[in-house]
Amino acid sequence: MATPRAPRWPPPSLLLLLLLPLLLLPPAAPGARGSLPSPAHRTLLPVAGPLSPPGAGHTAPGPGVATRRGRSGRVPRGVSAAAARNRWLESNNPEPHIGCSPSYQSQEDHSGSRKGVTAQNARMSHSSSEGPENPPLLPETSAEWSNMASSHRADIAGLRRGPSPEITTAPTAHSSLLSLESLPESPSSSRSQRRITPSQTESGTSLGFLERTRELPEEGTVHTQVAGTWVSRQASHPALEPGEPTVLSQKRNSSGQEHSGPPFSWSQSHPPPSDHPSSSGSIKNGNNFTALQNPSVTQTKSMLITDTYTNGVPRTLRSLPVGVDPADETEGFPEHSRLGITSMSVRSSPSVKDSRTNSGLTEHLGDGEGTELSTENGYGLPSIHWQSDAPSFGGRQLASSSEAGDGRAMPLTEAVFRSDPSIGGGESTGRWILTKKKTSTDAAESSALHPEAGGAGGLTQSSHAAQQPRGGGEDSGMGGRSYAESSSSSSSTSSSESLDSSAPLREHSLTGLSYTREHGSDAGQRTSSDHTDHGYVPSTFTKGERTLLSITDNTSYSEASESSTSSVKISDSPSQAQPKQSSMSSDDDEPAQSSTESPVLHTSNLPTYTSTVNMPNTLVLDTGTKPVEDPSDSRVPSTQPSPSQPQPFSSALPSTRSPGSTSETTTSSPSPSPISLLVSTLAPYSVSQTTFPHPSSTLVPHRPREPRVTSVQMSTAISAIALIPSNQTANPKNQSTPQQEKPITEAKSPSLVSPPTDSTKAVTVSLPPGAPWSPALTGFSTGPALPATSTSLAQMSPALTSAMPQTTHSPVTSPSTLSHVEALTSGAVVVHTTPKKPHLPTNPEILVPHISTEGAITTEGNREHTDPTTQPIPLTTSTTSAGERTTELGRAEESSPSHFLTPSSPQTTDVSTAEMLTSRYITFAAQSTSQSPTALPPLTPVNSCTVNPCLHDGKCIVDLTGRGYRCVCPPAWQGENCSVDVNECLSSPCPPLATCNNTQGSFTCRCPVGYQLEKGICNLVRTFVTEFKLKKTFLNTTAENHSNTQELENEIAQTLNVCFSTLPGYIRTTAHVSREPSTVFISLKTTFALASNVTLFDLADRIQKYVNSCRSSAEVCQLLGSQRRVFRAGSLCKRKSPECDKETSICTDLDGVALCQCKSGYFQFNKMDHSCRACEDGYRLENETCMSCPFGLGGLNCGNPYQLITVVIAAAGGGLLLILGVALIVTCCRKSKNDISKLIFKSGDFQMSPYTDVPKNPRSQEWGREAIEMHENGSTKNLLQMTDVYYSPTNVRNPELERNGLYPAYTGLPGSRHSCIFPGQYNPSFISDESRRRDYF
């Protein structure tokens, strides 16, 4: 346990001295800027010394205060002293700004934000040149400043501020405590990039502070950080009401340097309606605004301290008295009692939402783990920022909760968490800061710890600071990780939303949630305002895993009911709409736990309520509230995420405990499980119907003294579950939905619920854990609405110590029944909610958390009238970004953000819903009001296979990707529901010769006639078939007695079976009967085995014998006997023609097999052949064998004698030819050998020429009219043209022509001495010698 230490903070007198100049400084001229102190004084404020901002003539702060000169020493016109003060406070805060990015910050700053986180964890220091100039400290003339000046400002080191976006607010008619303004920040510099050199740090550290630091086990320096301030700025005339909360964070790093700077800043704007000046506020990165709280609240009360033990190490939570003067003997942080706890609210009409802000002062202590409480946005959701710090010397956190009232918001109490490194390395605890709030009489307040909520328009969580390992086996926490979130708004830097078509836009900027891990944390609570009741501060310790501590504190003010709740804030990036994560790493490589963000729909809140927060490993203590004196004064803003992106949301359920009600809870053994905190807020507002395609809420008119409304939320941690009952007495308004920040969820006790009257209906939501979430699932309802029962169930793991909450209710509240929890055992959780008569219809928003446990959960809601109507709406969950994991029971698992649904339906009915929740499925039963939801996705039942939709014995398998199931069909069926027959015949499943016939769900193979299917083969069998018709005489006796043909068929088949049963190889007989008007046709088929050798004659003989001694039906016997032959030859061939070759074979079926029988002279090699063959030429068939033919015969079967004929004719012809040849030869040999001239002139007609004595003449050159051409070419030839030879008749020669030489000299033949033409003439050309004669012959 951590030992008490002396107070480390300066006395309040020093702070008053520091703040006094602020009160004296007049407002500066517009557009001017305060002069910055010289760089020489750029030192930190001494912690022990007073912190005094520079006055009008005060150029430098008090001793040790570092100032720096800038461009101008003036404050812009309209900027209140509070803004100047804030600027002064921010200007002296060099700590890197690790907050949520405003909506107008680009994504470029995110990278810087990550760097800033790393630098903040590592406590890196840079040269002073990196830090931008600091604006001077400006005085504040407001009376509120003077009041707040009495508060204690602790350890405000020389705050140095870098340029940041300037936010200017103008005074308004309302009493503005402070307007915030920050100097513009250069785009290049991001809030996380501001550094401070070691020299600057050391110079500004007071001795007293260093001495206190040295006392610590590990050297470290406290860092004062302004966590951020929610500022309400009016659009036209910005004005801030009293009580602006600020958050101061103090961190230590191992370097021993003290840094102070703006850890993060927030921006929020809520434009009120026209009757009030619209106020909006936005603080950009690097802007830290600290607002002193009204010192009028000084009375504080002690708080209950709860010890929890983990690993045998006790932890003690201290109560810190809050007073004007700090007690030296107590380890307190009174200086921050007035600094970090201010609440700002904007006065507005009941129809608008008051902007409330919360800020917390967080001192990051203990092994790099600290918590920074960020402001509470319009949702009433405070946010917590965990950051890793240096070795702890005791942590303090001041949490302030917002107030809503008519300008009468009172200072809020603050919760201080102190962490002691009582547990060794490897253990760290993330803790929630207690926030308390108080209101003046007649003002109802509600506050809640909110996770950093990003703007409704969009949240950009940009920083995922890596955790740096610590020495000594310590687990370094998720140091300095924060989510930089930016939101955009229509009218201001923050995102804006139109809640109502007639109502003004409301803008909200939520901040992100960061986590750090500590070795241990002691939670102490401090109150800084009057009339505080009791605070319960539990502390938890978890080994190797951070645990979120949830604290609920209720303070009762005179005639006012107050309550505060803590909830985890989740945010999504604006553009990507995906949840960011914070990763946690440790030296021992334990799995990082991813934080998931889920958009939540935060609705208007009841004026009074108390909310209990459950966390594993901690005792969640009693919370109580008193009835609201004047709930109409309560103002709780109701916000809506912008339609541009899914919004972070916190789980919230309204719950209150009336005076006299008691709650008993039993927490289970500690387990390393983070929890999700629940926040429920109620606000009396009425807003006309508004619809958004994104999470939204409805506001209902305020009705004082309405019945209390509580909601039930149960969830289980991995190894522990705590149920805390609480009731709520207030005006029922809207109910915010539960949100679970991690797979391990908290439990919210069942409480009374007043369900809506007529306009509610049951909505059953089934959530598969991987489905995408659509922000368009929202519904709105006009008219008053009362939060209906919203039940969220989560399965708890085995060995849980469950607690049965018991709640007693005050009779003042409206009739409602107690919801009780049953069967809180491992494996199933059953919640029965039985609401009674509703008073106001409400529009419940249903959050669908992501549950990692398994089991069955049944939720039942029973209403009074009308039939139940359910609308199952699958919601989507998206897994966290890569690289981040959640460790649950030694198992790394991605947790997904929970999303919500706001279903609405025009017709409301009673609810009786029961859903089975299997692994990672969630079922909700809730009532929602009219107006159907927009863009509802198709329904997917939890188990679509409960009623098997698959036909034909199909197997149903749950499949969430499609219709919710899929059918595994048998082979014969196909289709989605196995309703389509598969045509098996396409795959040819039948054997050869068989015919496939497809049927529904099957197929058949039919062998042809004469074959039978046996063992998948068509085997040949002896088949005897016949067809005949009954005669008319048998119509009355046989056919008429059997009106049913089936009966006749059976009787005939039975008779033949008996008849043929004695024959060998008998198989069966089938009969088919068909009727016609005057006859009946009967066809029979009898089969025998092929080896039976049964013939048609055997069957005929057996039938005759059987008919003669008929023992069966007389009609059948008479029918068979009437047929001369029942089975006839050729019947099978008619039905089954083997297609025999008609020329060589004929079909026969006498033996029951249709065969082709060969004709005479032909043969078959196989009996199954359809044709027959003859023997080859020269062979004839003898005894089924082809034999050779005798000599001279050939052809078919030796029937052709051509060989013999050929031989005879050839011999005769040859002899004849031989004779003819011999005769010719003999004839030729007998010819005469006489001379040819003798043969020619043998006749007496030739005469000798008269010129025989005439000598030879030379060869004539011309002969006749044409010369005779003569030439020699190797031989001498005389060519005589016949044209030159003149034939003249004898004795007709003309002597005159002859004298004139006209006649040729020789007209005879060339070889003759005498002319043949002219006998007796001499041939002058005749040559006597033989050679010459040969030439002419």
From Swiss-Prot:
Residues 941-979, 981-1019 form the EGF-like domain. One of its GO terms (molecular function) is calcium ion binding. Residues 28-40, 54-66, 175-190, 486-502, 556-575, 637-675, 868-884 have a biased composition (Low complexity). Residues 32-1204 are extracellular. GO terms for biological process: cardiac atrium morphogenesis; cardiac muscle tissue growth; cell-cell junction organization; endothelial cell development; endothelial cell morphogenesis; heart development; in utero embryonic development; lung development. Residues 470-480 have a biased composition (Gly residues). Residues 885-896 have a biased composition (Basic and acidic residues). It is found in: Cell membrane; Cell junction. Residues 1-31 form the signal peptide. Disruption phenotype: Some mutant animals die in utero, but most die postnatally, about half before weaning as a result of pulmonary hemorrhage. Midgestation mutant embryos show cardiac defects characterized by invagination of the ventricular cavity into, and often through, the compact layer of ventricular myocardium. The septal myocardium is similarly honeycombed by endothelial-lined extensions from the ventricular cavity, a defect accompanied by the presence of ventricular septal defects in most late-gestation embryos. Residues 28-149, 175-211, 235-296, 313-675, 723-767, 860-909 are annotated as: Disordered. Glycans are attached at residue 1093. GO terms for cellular component: cell surface; cell-cell junction; external side of plasma membrane. Disulfide bonds join 945-956, 950-967, 969-978, 985-996, 990-1005, 1007-1018. The keyword Calcium applies. It is a single-pass type I membrane protein. Keywords: Calcium, Cell junction, Cell membrane, Developmental protein, Disulfide bond, EGF-like domain, Glycoprotein, Membrane, Phosphoprotein, Repeat, Signal, Transmembrane, Transmembrane helix. InterPro entries: EGF-like_Ca-bd_dom, EGF-like_dom, EGF-type_Asp/Asn_hydroxyl_site, EGF_Ca-bd_CS, NOTCH1_EGF-like. Interacts with CCM2 and KRIT1; KRIT1 markedly facilitates interaction with CCM2. Receptor component of the CCM signaling pathway which is a crucial regulator of heart and vessel formation and integrity. May be acting by stabilizing endothelial cell junctions. This is Protein HEG homolog 1. It comes from Mus musculus (Mouse).
